[in-house]
A protein has these predicted regions:
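Short helix-capping/linker segments at secondary-structure and domain boundaries
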Residues: 74-75, 181-189
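Compositionally biased, low-complexity flexible segments
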Residues: 221-226, 232-233
C-alpha cells in the first residue's frame, strides 16, 4: 500500500482518468462545493460564513469529495449524489445505497433521497474543477477491491443531520471518509486542500470507528460489516 502522494497542482492538464486498465489505484478528488451550480455554492458560502462567525475564524473554502477506484476488472467512481436524477440508478449509475435527505418521512419522494454510486466507467461531474487532485491513496489491488466491497454496507443516516450523534451532520464527505476507513486505509494524513475544509468528514470516520469497535466486541473481523449503524437503503416509491 502506498502512502498519500504529493497531489498534482490545480488545473493540471493530464486527463484524470488516464490509467492503464490493469493498474490498481484509489484516487481522491476534492471538488469545490457547488462547482457547476451557483445555488449550492451560494448556500455553502452562507453556511460557512455563519460557522466562521460562531467559531471566531475566517471563512474557509468548502469541498466535496469523490473517489476513482481502479482494479483489474475496471474503473469505478464512488460518490454521493443528491438530488437523484431518475429511478434508473442501480442499472445506469451503479447505485449501491440510497438514504433520506432532511427527514425519513419525506424519503418516499426521490427529491428527498441521496444515492451513493459505485459506478463502473462512471464520471465525476466537474472533475476538471478539482483542486490539488487526484491524490493517490493506495495502489494495492486488495485494498481497492475491499473498498469497493464495503460501499454496499454503508449506513444510510439522514443527510444533513447529525442522526448518529457524531457532532457533525452526515453528507457526501461522510460517505467517502467512511468507505476509506472501512477499507483499512489510514486516514490520518488525508484532508482537503490548504485553506479549505470538508464538513461531514469526521462524521464518517467516527461512524466507521464505532462500527469497527462494535464488530470487534461481537467477535467479527475488522473488515466484517455485520454490525450496522443506520439502515442501508430506503424504499423507493417515486
Amino acid at each position: 500500500m502506498a502512502g498519500v502522494t504529493q497531489p498534482k497542482p490545480a488545473g493540471a492538464s493530464e486527463p484524470p482518468f488516464a490509467r492503464a486498465a490493469s493498474q490498481a489505484s484509489i484516487e481522491l478528488y476534492w471538488l469545490p462545493l457547488g462547482a457547476g451550480g451557483w445555488l449550492v455554492r451560494l448556500n455553502g458560502r452562507i453556511y460557512e460564513a455563519i460557522h466562521a462567525f460562531l467559531e471566531r475564524r475566517r471563512p474557509l473554502d468548502l469541498y466535496h469529495s469523490a473517489l476513482i477506484v481502479q482494479v483489474p476488472e475496471g474503473r469505478f467512481v464512488i460518490e454521493d449524489a443528491w438530488p437523484i436524477p431518475d429511478a434508473d440508478g442501480p442499472s445506469s449509475r451503479g447505485v449501491a445505497v440510497e438514504g433520506p435527505v432532511g427527514s425519513r418521512r419525506m424519503a418516499r419522494w426521490r427529491v428527498f433521497r441521496y444515492e451513493v454510486r459505485r459506478w463502473r466507467d462512471g464520471v465525476i461531474a466537474d472533475a476538471s474543477e478539482a483542486v490539488a487532485s487526484p491524490q493517490l491513496l493506495s495502489d494495492d489491488p486488495l485494498v481497492a477491491r475491499r473498498l469497493l466491497d464495503v460501499v454496499g454496507s454503508l449506513p444510510s443516516p439522514v443527510w444533513g443531520r447529525d442522526e448518529l450523534k457524531t457532532g457533525e451532520m452526515w453528507n457526501s464527505n461522510s460517505v467517502i471518509a467512511w468507505v476509506l476507513a472501512q477499507s483499512g486505509l489510514s486516514t490520518d494524513a488525508i484532508g482537503p486542500p490548504a485553506g479549505g475544509r470538508a464538513p461531514g468528514w469526521q462524521a464518517g470516520l467516527i461512524t466507521a470507528r464505532h462500527q469497527q469497535l462494535s464488530d470487534e466486541q461481537a467477535g467479527h473481523g475488522a473488515g466484517d460489516a455485520t454490525s450496522r449503524v443506520g439502515r442501508p437503503g430506503v424504499a423507493a416509491t417515486a
